[in-house]
Amino acid sequence: MARIAGVDIPRDKRVEVALTYIYGIGLTRAKTILTKSDVNPDIRVKDLEDGDVQKLRTALEAFTIEGDLRRQEGMALKRLQDIGCLRGRRHRMSLPVRGQRTRTNARTRRGARKTVAGKKK
């Protein structure tokens, strides 16, 4: 396995697809990186030469990926929660943030059902 940006990317996949194993890189960004670094997207990772891998590493330095991106996203959520805006409060309460209904649905975001005792007659 080639190790790029601290991630072991699979050897048997095409470079274009293998780059998507890095957090923060999708197919479109992978294609952009490959064209900038002048690497053929159709070859397999195991067939890459050391020079090609080095080109990919230098091209990846221009993007925020992996741990830095995760930290940046976490800090953005924490900022929303600290300033007490609606989005931050909704994140804190594990409810949908973008205005979706919660009376029904929203089961994924709210988690498993919590049974509440019924009213006595």
From Swiss-Prot:
Assembly information from the UniProt record: Part of the 30S ribosomal subunit. Forms a loose heterodimer with protein S19. Forms two bridges to the 50S subunit in the 70S ribosome.
Residue ranges of the TM segments = none
Q: Which family does it belong to?
A: Belongs to the universal ribosomal protein uS13 family.
- Keywords recorded for this protein, A-Z: Ribonucleoprotein, Ribosomal protein, RNA-binding, rRNA-binding, tRNA-binding
Native organism: Prochlorococcus marinus (strain MIT 9313)
Q: Which InterPro entries match?
A: Rbsml_uS13_C, Ribosomal_uS13, Ribosomal_uS13-like_H2TH, Ribosomal_uS13_bac-type, Ribosomal_uS13_CS
Q: Which GO terms describe its biological process?
A: translation
Which Pfam families would you find in this protein's record?
A: Ribosomal_S13 (PF00416)
Annotated region Disordered: where?
97-121
Domain of life of the organism encoding this protein? Bacteria
What is the name listed in the Swiss-Prot or TrEMBL entry for this protein?
Answer: Small ribosomal subunit protein uS13
Amino acid composition bias (Basic residues), ranges on this chain: 100-121
Any idea what job this protein has?
A: Located at the top of the head of the 30S subunit, it contacts several helices of the 16S rRNA. In the 70S ribosome it contacts the 23S rRNA (bridge B1a) and protein L5 of the 50S subunit (bridge B1b), connecting the 2 subunits; these bridges are implicated in subunit movement. Contacts the tRNAs in the A and P-sites.
Any one cellular-component term (Gene Ontology): small ribosomal subunit
| Any GO MF annotation of the entry | rRNA binding
